[in-house]
Protein backbone atom coordinates (compact mmCIF):
# COMPACT_ATOMS: atom_id res chain seq x y z
CA UNK A 1 0.00 0.00 0.00
CA UNK A 2 1.23 3.46 -0.90
CA UNK A 3 0.68 6.67 1.02
CA UNK A 4 -0.85 9.91 -0.19
CA UNK A 5 -1.18 13.09 1.87
CA UNK A 6 -4.68 14.50 2.23
CA UNK A 7 -3.84 18.19 2.33
CA UNK A 8 -3.72 21.39 0.31
CA UNK A 9 -1.31 23.13 2.68
CA UNK A 10 2.05 23.71 0.95
CA UNK A 11 4.07 23.60 4.17
CA UNK A 12 2.52 20.31 5.30
CA UNK A 13 3.10 18.89 1.84
CA UNK A 14 6.75 19.98 1.81
CA UNK A 15 7.34 18.35 5.19
CA UNK A 16 5.57 15.13 4.20
CA UNK A 17 7.39 14.93 0.86
CA UNK A 18 10.73 15.36 2.63
CA UNK A 19 9.89 12.37 4.85
CA UNK A 20 10.15 10.17 1.77
CA UNK A 21 7.00 8.17 2.42
CA UNK A 22 4.25 9.80 0.37
CA UNK A 23 3.81 9.38 -3.35
CA UNK A 24 1.26 12.10 -4.04
CA UNK A 25 -1.53 14.19 -2.55
CA UNK A 26 -5.29 14.48 -2.53
CA UNK A 27 -7.20 17.71 -2.12
CA UNK A 28 -10.86 18.66 -1.94
CA UNK A 29 -12.80 21.94 -2.00
CA UNK A 30 -12.87 22.13 1.81
CA UNK A 31 -9.09 21.73 2.11
CA UNK A 32 -8.49 24.28 -0.63
CA UNK A 33 -10.90 26.76 0.97
CA UNK A 34 -8.93 26.55 4.23
CA UNK A 35 -5.90 27.92 2.39
CA UNK A 36 -7.79 31.02 1.26
CA UNK A 37 -6.00 31.16 -2.09
CA UNK A 38 -6.80 30.99 -5.77
CA UNK A 39 -7.30 27.32 -6.63
CA UNK A 40 -5.22 27.27 -9.79
CA UNK A 41 -2.36 29.26 -8.29
CA UNK A 42 -2.30 26.86 -5.35
CA UNK A 43 -2.19 23.84 -7.67
CA UNK A 44 0.66 25.39 -9.63
CA UNK A 45 2.64 25.57 -6.39
CA UNK A 46 1.76 22.02 -5.34
CA UNK A 47 2.89 20.44 -8.61
CA UNK A 48 6.31 21.97 -8.00
CA UNK A 49 6.56 20.26 -4.60
CA UNK A 50 5.28 16.77 -5.35
CA UNK A 51 6.36 14.54 -8.22
CA UNK A 52 3.34 12.28 -8.15
CA UNK A 53 -0.44 12.21 -8.60
CA UNK A 54 -2.29 15.27 -7.28
CA UNK A 55 -6.06 14.90 -7.02
CA UNK A 56 -7.97 18.14 -7.65
CA UNK A 57 -11.76 18.21 -7.50
CA UNK A 58 -14.31 19.76 -9.82
CA UNK A 59 -17.07 21.96 -8.41
CA UNK A 60 -19.69 21.61 -11.15
CA UNK A 61 -22.50 19.10 -10.63
CA UNK A 62 -23.53 18.63 -14.27
CA UNK A 63 -21.62 16.53 -16.78
CA UNK A 64 -20.72 19.34 -19.18
CA UNK A 65 -19.59 21.58 -16.34
CA UNK A 66 -17.45 18.80 -14.90
CA UNK A 67 -15.88 18.11 -18.28
CA UNK A 68 -14.97 21.76 -18.76
CA UNK A 69 -13.34 22.01 -15.34
CA UNK A 70 -11.65 18.62 -15.71
CA UNK A 71 -10.03 19.49 -19.01
CA UNK A 72 -8.79 22.79 -17.61
CA UNK A 73 -7.29 21.06 -14.55
CA UNK A 74 -5.71 18.25 -16.55
CA UNK A 75 -4.09 20.76 -18.91
CA UNK A 76 -2.22 22.34 -16.00
CA UNK A 77 0.14 19.41 -15.40
CA UNK A 78 0.42 15.70 -16.30
CA UNK A 79 0.27 14.73 -12.61
CA UNK A 80 -3.17 16.23 -12.05
CA UNK A 81 -5.86 13.63 -11.36
CA UNK A 82 -9.40 15.00 -11.60
CA UNK A 83 -11.68 14.19 -8.67
CA UNK A 84 -15.27 13.57 -9.72
CA UNK A 85 -18.19 13.04 -7.31
CA UNK A 86 -19.95 9.67 -7.31
CA UNK A 87 -23.13 10.70 -9.13
CA UNK A 88 -24.81 9.75 -12.40
CA UNK A 89 -23.61 13.00 -13.95
CA UNK A 90 -20.16 12.34 -12.56
CA UNK A 91 -19.87 8.89 -14.09
CA UNK A 92 -20.94 10.22 -17.47
CA UNK A 93 -18.03 12.64 -17.21
CA UNK A 94 -15.66 9.86 -16.14
CA UNK A 95 -16.51 7.84 -19.25
CA UNK A 96 -15.68 10.79 -21.52
CA UNK A 97 -12.51 11.68 -19.63
CA UNK A 98 -11.32 8.08 -19.80
CA UNK A 99 -11.63 8.21 -23.59
CA UNK A 100 -9.62 11.45 -23.58
CA UNK A 101 -6.83 9.94 -21.49
CA UNK A 102 -7.55 12.07 -18.42
CA UNK A 103 -7.11 10.30 -15.08
CA UNK A 104 -9.98 10.45 -12.60
CA UNK A 105 -10.55 9.79 -8.93
CA UNK A 106 -14.20 9.13 -8.10
CA UNK A 107 -14.80 10.48 -4.63
CA UNK A 108 -17.49 10.26 -1.94
CA UNK A 109 -17.90 6.51 -2.42
CA UNK A 110 -19.95 4.89 0.35
CA UNK A 111 -20.95 1.50 -1.08
CA UNK A 112 -19.27 -1.32 -2.96
CA UNK A 113 -21.71 -1.05 -5.84
CA UNK A 114 -20.88 2.65 -6.22
CA UNK A 115 -17.22 1.69 -6.48
CA UNK A 116 -18.04 -0.99 -9.06
CA UNK A 117 -20.03 1.48 -11.16
CA UNK A 118 -17.16 3.97 -11.02
CA UNK A 119 -14.69 1.31 -12.13
CA UNK A 120 -16.92 0.26 -15.03
CA UNK A 121 -17.23 3.89 -16.11
CA UNK A 122 -13.43 4.03 -16.36
CA UNK A 123 -12.26 5.64 -13.13
CA UNK A 124 -8.52 5.47 -12.50
CA UNK A 125 -9.10 5.56 -8.73
CA UNK A 126 -12.04 5.27 -6.35
CA UNK A 127 -12.04 6.81 -2.88
CA UNK A 128 -14.23 5.11 -0.26
CA UNK A 129 -14.63 7.29 2.85
CA UNK A 130 -13.94 5.29 6.00
CA UNK A 131 -14.28 7.87 8.76
CA UNK A 132 -17.50 9.39 7.51
CA UNK A 133 -19.16 5.97 7.52
CA UNK A 134 -17.88 5.33 11.03
CA UNK A 135 -19.40 8.66 12.08
CA UNK A 136 -22.92 7.43 11.30
CA UNK A 137 -22.45 4.08 13.02
CA UNK A 138 -21.48 2.03 9.95
CA UNK A 139 -18.20 0.21 9.34
CA UNK A 140 -15.90 2.00 6.91
CA UNK A 141 -13.32 -0.77 6.97
CA UNK A 142 -15.95 -3.34 6.03
CA UNK A 143 -16.82 -1.21 3.02
CA UNK A 144 -13.15 -1.08 2.04
CA UNK A 145 -12.87 -4.86 2.34
CA UNK A 146 -15.97 -5.35 0.18
CA UNK A 147 -14.61 -3.07 -2.54
CA UNK A 148 -11.21 -4.75 -2.59
CA UNK A 149 -12.86 -8.17 -2.77
CA UNK A 150 -15.17 -7.17 -5.63
CA UNK A 151 -12.33 -5.59 -7.59
CA UNK A 152 -10.17 -8.66 -7.05
CA UNK A 153 -12.88 -11.10 -8.12
CA UNK A 154 -13.52 -9.21 -11.34
CA UNK A 155 -9.92 -8.26 -12.10
CA UNK A 156 -10.62 -4.53 -12.22
CA UNK A 157 -7.70 -2.19 -12.85
CA UNK A 158 -9.17 0.76 -10.92
CA UNK A 159 -7.07 1.51 -7.84
CA UNK A 160 -8.63 1.84 -4.37
CA UNK A 161 -7.73 4.82 -2.20
CA UNK A 162 -8.75 4.49 1.45
CA UNK A 163 -9.91 8.01 2.31
CA UNK A 164 -11.37 9.87 5.30
CA UNK A 165 -8.64 8.30 7.43
CA UNK A 166 -8.98 9.32 11.08
CA UNK A 167 -6.30 7.37 12.96
CA UNK A 168 -3.38 4.92 12.66
CA UNK A 169 -5.72 1.94 13.08
CA UNK A 170 -7.49 2.90 9.86
CA UNK A 171 -4.11 2.91 8.11
CA UNK A 172 -3.02 -0.49 9.43
CA UNK A 173 -6.34 -2.12 8.64
CA UNK A 174 -6.46 -0.58 5.16
CA UNK A 175 -3.04 -2.09 4.43
CA UNK A 176 -4.18 -5.51 5.72
CA UNK A 177 -7.35 -5.38 3.63
CA UNK A 178 -5.39 -4.62 0.48
CA UNK A 179 -6.10 -0.98 -0.40
CA UNK A 180 -3.76 0.31 -3.08
CA UNK A 181 -3.39 3.66 -1.32
CA UNK A 182 -4.25 5.37 1.95
CA UNK A 183 -4.60 9.13 1.84
CA UNK A 184 -3.87 10.47 5.30
CA UNK A 185 -4.08 13.90 6.92
CA UNK A 186 -0.78 15.38 8.06
CA UNK A 187 -1.53 14.88 11.77
CA UNK A 188 -2.25 11.18 11.24
CA UNK A 189 0.89 10.76 9.12
CA UNK A 190 2.97 12.17 11.97
CA UNK A 191 1.33 9.76 14.43
CA UNK A 192 2.42 6.80 12.30
CA UNK A 193 6.08 7.46 13.08
CA UNK A 194 5.60 7.34 16.84
CA UNK A 195 5.53 4.53 19.39
CA UNK A 196 6.27 4.89 23.11
CA UNK A 197 8.69 1.94 23.08
CA UNK A 198 10.64 3.47 20.19
CA UNK A 199 11.03 6.73 22.11
CA UNK A 200 11.91 4.90 25.33
CA UNK A 201 14.46 2.77 23.48
CA UNK A 202 16.18 5.83 22.02
CA UNK A 203 16.42 7.44 25.46
CA UNK A 204 17.89 4.25 26.94
CA UNK A 205 20.46 3.86 24.17
CA UNK A 206 21.56 7.47 24.62
CA UNK A 207 21.73 7.11 28.40
CA UNK A 208 23.82 3.94 28.11
CA UNK A 209 26.12 5.63 25.60
CA UNK A 210 26.66 8.56 27.94
CA UNK A 211 27.91 6.13 30.62
CA UNK A 212 30.90 5.36 28.40
CA UNK A 213 32.11 8.96 28.62
Curated annotation (Swiss-Prot):
Pfam families xrefs: TAL_FSA
Family statement drawn from the similarity comment of this UniProt entry: Belongs to the transaldolase family. Type 3B subfamily.
Catalytic residues identified in the record: 83
GO cellular component: cytoplasm
Pathway involvement of the protein, from the record: Carbohydrate degradation; pentose phosphate pathway; D-glyceraldehyde 3-phosphate and beta-D-fructose 6-phosphate from D-ribose 5-phosphate and D-xylulose 5-phosphate (non-oxidative stage): step 2/3
Keyword field: Cytoplasm, Pentose shunt, Schiff base, Transferase
PROSITE patterns linked to this entry: TRANSALDOLASE_1, TRANSALDOLASE_2
Keyword match Transferase: yes
Class of the enzyme per the UniProt entry, highest EC level: transferase
EC number: 2.2.1.2
Broad class of where this protein is predominantly found: cytoplasm
Localisation per UniProt entry: Cytoplasm
Annotated catalysed reactions: D-sedoheptulose 7-phosphate + D-glyceraldehyde 3-phosphate = D-erythrose 4-phosphate + beta-D-fructose 6-phosphate
Reported function: Transaldolase is important for the balance of metabolites in the pentose-phosphate pathway.
GO molecular function, one term: aldehyde-lyase activity
Gene Ontology BP terms: carbohydrate metabolic process; pentose-phosphate shunt
Secreted found in the keyword field: no
Record organism: Desulfitobacterium hafniense (strain Y51)
InterPro entries: Aldolase_TIM, TAL/FSA, Transaldolase_3B, Transaldolase_3B/F6P_aldolase, Transaldolase_AS, TSA/FSA_arc/bac
Protein name, as recorded: Probable transaldolase
Amino acid sequence: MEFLLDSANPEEIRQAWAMGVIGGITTNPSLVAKEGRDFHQLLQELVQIVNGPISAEVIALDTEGMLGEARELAAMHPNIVVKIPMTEEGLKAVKVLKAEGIKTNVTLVFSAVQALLAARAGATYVSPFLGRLDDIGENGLLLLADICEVFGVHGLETKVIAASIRNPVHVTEAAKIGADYATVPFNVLCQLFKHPLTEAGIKKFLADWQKLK
